[in-house]
């Protein structure tokens, strides 16, 4: 890991100006950052709105993991050059879980922190009070769980989801026991570190881990963090099921991109989640040389996958594709993911698979903003030789 990887910038990002004034005029809206404390039925939530929402397209809404806030979780990604093309087309709404934002005061004694279900039910109020048309969710860990619950309860508000390290299951009794034992032996920050990073990462990338350890120790209110962690550890099972024709199963209705690093502590949970979603609307992206923080360690891959994802939804038809496009003639690394399958095979950097819109088989025709097709990439075409459709699994 190079030294630059751990030199993290947590300042609010701004899109880079284009080289041509014409490009600026066409693509860049005035980039305004506004912070809001929004009152909801389950308490106040702090949000940061970047850019002015456009009436004919959704807003990217982010939700961070435990031990983080929106800056330390996502600024490395949004400050990355390849993401600037996306932020020229979409406004971004960053949501901080209650009490996790910078400078948050401690909750009073006896305060009942919202459950994970209640945190999800805060989001309709955010969308409505900010006057947003709809959202594309980007969440990691606990934030991915919250956004998924929100999408299940309010499908009309969510056009798509990018879920990093999603765990759809309630905490098992063995996990509960491990948490209790860890709580006796280690401080809260170490418990959070074990959630964010695998043991391999702790040893192979100590600088990055130490950067976030210091952030958790000094920048996050410890009392509030403990409440958030307790809420996440008390989560319910999402109870999603892979849809069967003719049945009334609970599953996501929107296109979904599941992302996980090959050494992430959440890799098995993400594969299991993939097995429970609609295979015609879901893509699983496994990243090599990456652990629990793909948005920090592999921002180029994640930005490129995000571009493909929104293109598959009918947005940004002229977006430039670089890294993954150049490898379009390489071997396709897509394989079917089935229940119980825990394959962790990955292609090398020179054999990257198409991340979202399978270039050879997928239509990229798009209509204007007012009449866009919201269909996801046609994953049925990839496995048309099978009787049962299977979700796309991609390694890069």
Swiss-Prot record:
Keywords: Developmental protein, Repeat. The keyword Magnesium does not apply. Residues 326-396 are annotated as: Disordered. Sequence repeats lie at residues 340-349, 350-359, 360-369, 370-379. InterPro entries: AB_hydrolase_fold, NDRG. It comes from the Eukaryota. Disulfide bonds: none annotated. GO terms for biological process: pronephros development; signal transduction. Pfam families: Ndr (PF03096). GO terms for cellular component: cytoplasm. Residues 340-379 are annotated as: 4 X 10 AA tandem repeats of G-[NS]-R-S-R-[AS]-[HQ]-T-[DGN]-[DET]. Residues 366-377 have a biased composition (Basic and acidic residues). Residues 378-390 have a biased composition (Polar residues). Residues 327-340 have a biased composition (Low complexity). The keyword S-adenosyl-L-methionine does not apply. Belongs to the NDRG family. May be involved in pronephros development, after specification of the pronephros. This is Protein NDRG1-B. The lineage of its organism: Eukaryota, Metazoa, Chordata, Craniata, Vertebrata. The gene is ndrg1-b.
